[in-house]
Structures are given as C-alpha cells and as structure tokens.
Design a protein with these regions (language model features):
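C-terminal tail/sorting-segment detector
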Residues: 2-3, 28, 283, 569-580
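Bacterial N-terminal signal peptides
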Residues: 9-16
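Sec/Tat signal peptide C-region and signal peptidase I cleavage site
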Residues: 17-21
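A sequence-level/structural motif corresponding to short, flexible coil/turn segments enriched
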Residues: 22-538
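A glycine-anchored, Pro-Gly-centered beta-turn/N-cap motif
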Residues: 52, 566-569
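A short, compositionally biased
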Residues: 178, 334, 405, 546-551, ...
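Residue-level detector of functionally pivotal "anchor" positions at catalytic/ligand-binding pockets or at interdomain
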Residues: 534-558
Length: 580
C-alpha cells in the first residue's frame, strides 16, 4: 500500500543560524528516519532528480522477534515493515524516498524487506529520464523467517508491489549469511523498477575462511547524460558481469592468491566498469602489475570524462602498479591515495596522480577517502587521515595530521592536469573528525563531523582559492557522538546534509536558541536530514580581493562574482570601480 508522510517540520523550522559575519545558514527543514534496532540505521546520500525533487537514501534495521520490524519517521511508527529476521543482530534494509525540496515531504517511498544490504557499498545515481539507478550489495540471512537460498533480495516499489531478485542457482551459505552479490536496479520516475541485473563473484572454498562470502566491494556509482552507468570498487576473486548477448564478462583478480577469505583483509584489485543504459557490460579500466591491494573509492562524471580516486599499497617498493600504462607510485609500507581521469568513450586514462604518504608520529597512516566532487573545473577530495599528503616523490607534507587520531581533510586539484592547488586539514579539536563532501560557491563549505559530542555535525567555511579556514560552525549536536555523515547535495545555494547519532533528541543549533528534534532513544541510532540555505555577507569581499590569485576577478557589493564589465559598482583587487 502506498503511503505518504510529511517528514517533519518544513516551513515551521524556518530558523536562521548567524554563525558569523561571513556565513548565514538558514534551516529550511529537518526530519528523522530510523529503525528500532541497536544498529543498522545509517544515512547514505541525497541526490537531485531530473524533475528537481530529491532522492534520499538511508539504511534502517529490523528484527521481527524483538517486535522492532517497522520503520519510524520523525519518531513515529509507519506501516513499512523490514526483513523478517530473528537472529541475534538485525536486518539492514534499504530506504529510498523521493522528497520535496521545499519542505522535505515524501512523494513516494521504496524499501527492501528481504536481504541484508551493506550501505557502504550501496548507491543511488539519478538519470536524465527522471528516474535513477540503484546498486545494493545484498546477501540473504540464514536466520530470516522466510529464508530461501535462491532468493537474494526483495524490494517494495512505490506502488506497494514487490519485486524479487531470485537466482537460478543456490547461494553459498555461511553460518549466518549467504554469499553477497551486487544488485543493479533501474527505477523510473514513479519509483517502479524497469530492469535488474545481478553481478555475482566467484566464491572461494579452498581457503582458511571458507567459503569467501564477500568477494567484491562496489564502492562507487555514477551515470552520464546518455544513461550509461559507471561502477567501481575492488574485487578479490572473479567478478561476473552480464553482457547484452547473454554471455558474461569475467574480471579475474591476480593478486589475492594468499587471501584467507576474510572480507576485512586489504587485498584484491581495483576496477572501473562502464555499463550501457540497460545495465550490460561495455568496457572496463583495470589495474596491471603487482600490489598488496588497490581500490577505487569514488567516481564522478563530467563532460565525457570519468574521474576517480582510490587507495593502493604495494608488496615491495620495486613493484610496478599501473592503470592503462600510467604508474601508481604507491608505498609498500603505507597505504597511498591516487586519483585520475579517463575518457568514457574508450575508457583510456588521461592522467594518473599519486600523493606520497607521510607517516604520523607513530609511523603509520590511515586514509578514509570519503568523497570526490567535480565543480568549476576542479576536483575536490574529502575524507579523513592520520598522516599527511606530499607531492609524488617528495617527503614534505602539504597537508598533515601528525597525530594518530583521524582528522578531516579537503584537497583541491585541477581537473585537466590533476595538479593539487590547495589543501586543508581539520585541527579545531582533539577528537576524531571527517569530511564527507562540499558545497561550492564563492566560498567552500565542507560538511563533516567532530566526534566531540558538544560539537557534532559541522560546516567548515574555506577560502575557495587557498582552502584557508575562515570558520567552523556546529549545526547539530547533543546527539551522542556523530560519526557518520551522508553524501550531501548542493542545489544552488541549498545544502542538504544528513548524519547519524544516538540519543533521545538531536539539537539543531540556531545561534543562542536550540531546536530539539525527537529521534528514537539512547539505545539505538537515529538518522537526521537537514536542508540549509547558505548565504555569505559582504565581509567576504575583503579576503576575496587581496590575494594574487584573485587578480582581475570582480565582485559586486554583495560579495558575488561578476563580470568586470558589469554595470554599477564592482570591486577588483580591493578597489571600487563604477561602470556606466
């Protein structure tokens, strides 16, 4: 049965954060989503559909033997019932909602009610026809009430009808889970499924942790204007991809001969695959050479190019690892971040760039590569690190966190050459932090978290040219320790974000006032989504006019970039000019 919900407060929460003279962030609306299980509630992403509405993707947990199988919206029970799981954990269900940008109200809902998803390897990407593509890493739960070892996944479409993913052969069974497979679904503008594809991987049975149940991580998804689909990640055995002629493209991993089968091990090889608009294999871009592991974490599409970022580590420094003949100069002692671009016509690499890793004070380094965004001819990388980045072949870090706690970072590179132009590493507190994406205007706003519960979800304002920090404000706290942020959406001057915390309420800050939002209880996680209108005052003009990088760039009295020949008063390099 189709059912509509108004997600929270809408226009009633038209409150304003005047955090400083620079940033005015007006709260348009906020709402919460959660299951009633102790785990399994996570924000994933917000995207904009072709018709201007939003698509919001979350994960929520259900556990039928505990009476917690129903989804809650704004802390009230709904009729949406998740997987019939009776084990000692929970079933992680997918939740996809088409919402109004005006107030966050729900236009329709799609959700899963059979099969467990890994939200870190599940994604949504809008298509030009008004629909979207969704991918899910899914596996069956042996303890599910209705377990069927040929049934992988089930989705309730927007009209209330079910769509089942059933396989021709039985799934390999572990003690509690089946093997995982990657499901690709094409939805139309009305929330109905047009087609489905399943990418299975070879399950290894002659290894210590047999059988290997998770053999491929599909880490990233994007689409182009023609409906072509791009997927990327890491595979550790063989990956089977359907082709239009009813044959199968097989990708064979060459570096995991000694793999134990533990899904947490760093092993396997990267892949980027192009599928046509019907979900069939077209082409691929793979790694060559020897490595301990290589992985693609993020991809973005723009003007016939696919941009990507990932991590790699060699077995020995003398090993050669490359993509399309261009080397990834990864370290054998520290994981290394790399990025590049390729033509979508032939999937040939334009450039590959490597960032040298600089160890922290304990001689180690961890990189969490959260997001890649293409905007205004620049690439913006966000994540967290507990070491530093240096130019390839150098040892002096241009961005560094010398401590052992992970800290959020933002890097900016030229999208044509790949050259790094600016960097920033969060240093505002002693807690763990991370950034998950950016809003790009005359300034940059990075969204992320500071695990200090008094700070929570933050917006950090950066100078667009230098990435020098101007201010950091908290937009949601007293929600436990926030440690997960949704991939955000920029829609003009609107920034739609989400986070996960644990507490009876989330406190959305508004200057000296607070706006508590009821979200579950202290015994389970809750997810909050918030829409903000971002505006900057005239004080930004002074900084915008004093650096060499700003030469010949003109601003009006409101601090907005304008054509130098525009009529009226313009400010160039700190001087006012009157054009008649």
């Amino acid at each position: 049965m189709k059912r509509k919900f108004t997600l929270l407060v809408g226009a009633l929460l038209a409150l304003s954060i005047n955090a400083s003279a620079q940033l005015a962030a007006t709260l348009n609306w906020a709402h919460s989503v959660q299951g009633q299980t102790s785990s399994g509630n996570s924000p994933v992403s917000i995207d904009k559909l072709a018709d201007g509405n939003y698509i919001v993707f979350s994960e929520w947990g259900s556990k039928s033997d505990a009476g917690t199988e129903y989804l809650y919206i704004d802390n009230a029970a709904t009729s949406f019932k998740g997987g019939e799981y009776t084990g000692n954990s929970y079933c992680a269900n997918a939740l996809i909602q088409k919402t109004s940008p005006a107030d966050g109200s729900v236009l329709w809902t799609v959700y899963s009610n059979y099969g467990y998803i890994n939200s870190g390897c599940s994604h949504v990407s809008p298509t030009a026809d008004g629909g979207f593509v969704a991918t899910f890493e899914a596996h069956g739960l042996v303890s599910a009430k209705d377990f069927d070892n040929k049934k992988l996944f089930s989705v309730v479409q927007a009209d209330g009808s079910s769509y089942n993913i059933t396989l021709d052969t039985e799934l390999h069974l572990g003690s509690s889970n089946t093997e995982a497979a990657n499901v690709i679904l094409k939805f139309d503008a009305n929330g109905s499924i047009e087609w489905s594809r399943v990418l299975r991987s070879k399950v290894l049975t002659d290894i210590p942790n047999s059988p290997s149940l998770t053999n491929t991580n599909l880490n990233a998804l994007t689409t182009d204007e023609d409906g072509n689909i791009y997927i990327a990640g890491n595979y550790r055995s063989e990956l089977y991809i359907p082709k239009a002629d009813n044959t199968t493209e097989t990708l064979s991993c060459g570096n995991s001969a000694g793999w134990s089968g533990n899904a947490q091990d760093a092993t396997g090889e990267l892949f980027i695959v192009k599928l046509n608009k019907d979900g069939f294999f077209e082409n691929s871009l793979l790694a060559s050479g020897k490595s301990e592991f290589s992985d693609i974490d993020n991809i973005a599409y723009g003007s016939g190019k696919i941009y990507f970022s990932g991590r790699a580590k060699k077995v020995d420094d003398a090993d050669v690892l490359s993509i399309d003949g261009q080397n990834i100069n990864a370290s054998a002692s520290l994981q290394t971040m790399f990025y590049g671009a390729a033509s979508t016509t032939d999937m040939k690499a334009d450039f590959i760039k490597t960032l040298a890793s600089v160890a922290n004070s304990k001689g180690s380094m961890v990189i969490q590569n959260k997001n890649l965004k293409l905007a205004d001819g620049k690439l913006y990388f966000t994540g967290s690190v507990n070491g530093g980045f240096a130019e390839d072949g150098k040892t002096e870090a241009f961005a560094s966190n010398n401590g052992t706690m992970l800290k959020g970072f933002v890097l900016k590179a030229d999208a044509t050459t790949g050259d790094i132009e600016a960097s920033y590493c969060f240093a505002d507190s002693k807690s763990v932090s991370a950034y998950y994406g950016t809003w790009i205007g005359d300034k940059i706003v990075a969204t992320g978290y500071d695990m200090n519960a008094a700070v929570g979800h933050v917006f950090t304002v950066l100078n667009k040219e230098t990435l020098e920090k101007e201010e950091t404000i908290s937009v949601c706290n007293t929600f436990g320790s926030i440690a997960m942020i949704a991939t955000p959406l920029q829609d003009g001057n609107t920034f739609v974000v989400g986070n996960r915390g644990k507490g009876e309420t989330a406190t959305i800050l508004n200057g000296s006032e607070t706006t508590p939002l009821a979200v579950g209880s202290k015994s389970y996680w809750g997810v909050v989504y918030m829409s903000y209108a971002l505006n900057f005052g005239t004080t930004g003009i002074e900084k915008a006019a004093i650096t060499d990088a700003e030469d010949a760039k003109a601003y009006n009295l409101a601090g907005q970039r304008v054509n130098p020949a525009s009529k009226g008063i313009t400010i160039i390099n700190g001087h006012k000019y009157l054009n008649k």
